[in-house]
Amino acid sequence: MRGLLQDVRFALRQLRKNPAYTVAATVMLAVAICANGTVFSWIDGTMLHPIPGARDMSSLVSVMRGQWNSSPTPPFSYLDYRDLRDQNHSFEGIIGYHHDWLALTGGAKPERIYVANVTANYFDVLGVKPLYGRFFRPEEEAAGRSIPYVILSYSLWKTHFAGDPGIVGKPLEIARHPVTVIGVAPKGFVGAAPGLRHDMWMTLDPLGTGGWRTTERSGNWLVVVGRLRPGVSREQANQDLETIMRRIVAAYPNDHLGTNTITLDPMWRSPFGANGYMASTLPILLAIAAMVLLLTCANVATLTDRKSNV
């Protein structure tokens, strides 16, 4: 320990003797460390934890019709989703959702919030437990109510309702329609769309208006995510869903005139969130971070060599 303290004191004396070298080396190292820290933080958030708050994200997959690099439009109707969910043998569960901006009304002025319409098993499949209240029940999935149920995100609950647990059971207004809060999501969970943050969740047909969203196979509007069973690979699950999809297309050919192949990808590659659009930049960011680090090391080494020769 005494030797270590002596080395530290010697190093500090040398740094005081060469303030220009000290400042230059510190600035270069700080820039390199910040650049690399930013890149690797982004990698952690997009690849390792694309859905914060969800259980075992490695078994979650994005279910798409067509290829990843094709136009990322929501690929499934509710009826197709329901058949895929009920007939497969590869998934613990499959969820569907659709998101849009709506107005939180009833206050001094309307405020836009990001609202997701979700299937009733949404939170259960993701492994999320309510902080307060409860989540949706199966019978509430597509059955409308005169006063729909909603679930608040932790952030919206904190910022707009002062973190009051008593908000559960209270009425709100969404786009001038009355709704009832039945639950609050836990801190950290922001939804199943990688890189996006949902403020509120509702059922698929909250007002019970019916129409094409829950009755027509040609109305493709649901983004679909599945959780693989233990021991099932993406390839096996892909074949399973392809088989089901072929049966659906054969039974309803007029409602499936486009591409009907199924593609499963890790959630960080999902084109239905912010991460999907940024995934192609990952190799470029890694290369830039590596170059910055190498150049910094080379510059610091050059400064050190010149200082020692003075």
Please provide the spans of the model-predicted regions.
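Membrane-helix entry/capping segments
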Residues: 1-24, 53-56, 68, 109-110, ...
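Residue-level recognition of pore/gate-forming positions within transmembrane alpha-helices
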Residues: 28-33, 243
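Hydrophobic alpha-helical membrane-associated segments
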Residues: 31-35, 39, 229, 289-295
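Alpha-helical transmembrane segments
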Residues: 31-59, 305
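Short amphipathic beta-strand/extended segments in non-transmembrane regions
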Residues: 61-65, 79-137
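Mid-to-C-terminal secondary-structure elements
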Residues: 101, 115-139, 147-283
